[in-house]
Amino acid sequence: KADRDKPMNIEADALKHDDQKQLTIFNGKVHMTKGTMVLKAARMEVQQDNKGHQIAKLSAEPGERIFFRQKREGLDEYSEGEVETAVYNSQEDTLTLTTRAELRLLRGTVVADRIQGQQIVLNNTTEVFMVDGKANAATGASGSQRVRATLTPRAKTNETAPTATGTPLKPSQRIGNDKP
């Protein structure tokens, strides 16, 4: 959530900008950061509307995948993964991963959960993600598979304090034995 209003910083081997269309194309070893979000791809097209909202379309080299990583709000946890194509929408604060999508949830540095599908949509505002195993005809993705997930239970914590038993303590000004 905190990343939503952060600036988008991009490095690449080459850049082409069309001011008329408000379209910027980055090619070659693209590295984008936006707050704690990191995206690495071969190519990225950023379209900006007149309100400043950005849509970034990322693609990998043939046979390769894009890498992404983002810290989860208020936790020592990260979402990371790989995919062939991705679209980041700054207005909706969503990241859509399409074709051979894999999402890993890390607790600290340990992979806790792993989710795979043809399309994964992450909503950073609501912290909800949806996974689909079917190919998306709109993106030209081929093939279909079942969604696969490995989910690790969270460590148990004491959510409530133990209930007090016995006689409550009373304040005293004396220390020691009160017996005669």
Model-inferred region functions:
Residues 1-180:
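Mature-chain termini and adjacent capping regions
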